[in-house]
């Protein structure tokens, strides 16, 4: 890795994001598409920008992301986690602010498996007493 680039891996649900921070003007490129074209939902775009806005580094870096797996929400969360880790790689003093906002901790919630005899993970067939 060159000194001009910082890297972070982020994960959320089944999505994995590889994030590269390079000095620049604030462009965010996800799978060779812009942030606005990749995410249709404004909430997903907001989630991706959260660590940058918190640390006031929005216009400071160009961000290149490759993300695979999961859905829209999981991918947005994975990118946020990856950006957070890359920012900590860039400047360790940002860790406390990012930790306080809850961006450093990997969200460990996963989909619960479906059980035999049930319709879904917890939904049971209707019970008939008689």
UniProtKB/Swiss-Prot annotation:
Keywords: Ribonucleoprotein, Ribosomal protein. InterPro entries: Ribosomal_Su5_D2-typ_SF, Ribosomal_uS9, Ribosomal_uS9_bac/plastid, Ribosomal_uS9_CS, Ribsml_uS5_D2-typ_fold_subgr. Coiled coil: none annotated. The keyword Ribosomal protein applies. The keyword Ribonucleoprotein applies. One of its GO terms (molecular function) is RNA binding. It holds the Pfam family Ribosomal_S9. GO terms for cellular component: cytosolic small ribosomal subunit. GO terms for biological process: translation. Belongs to the universal ribosomal protein uS9 family. NCBIfam families: PRK00132.1. This is Small ribosomal subunit protein uS9. It comes from Pseudomonas fluorescens (strain Pf0-1).
């Amino acid at each position: 890795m060159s000194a001009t680039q910082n890297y972070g891996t982020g994960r959320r649900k089944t999505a994995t994001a590889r994030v590269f921070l390079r000095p620049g003007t604030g462009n965010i490129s996800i799978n060779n598409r812009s942030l606005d074209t990749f995410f249709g939902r404004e909430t997903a775009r907001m989630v991706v920008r959260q660590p940058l806005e918190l640390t006031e580094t929005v216009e400071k870096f160009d961000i290149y992301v490759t993300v695979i797996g999961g859905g829209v929400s999981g991918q947005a969360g994975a990118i946020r986690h990856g950006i957070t880790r890359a920012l900590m790689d860039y400047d360790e003093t940002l860790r406390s602010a990012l930790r306080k906002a809850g961006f450093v901790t990997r969200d460990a919630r996963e989909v619960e498996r479906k059980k035999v005899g049930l319709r879904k993970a917890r939904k049971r067939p209707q019970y008939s007493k008689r």
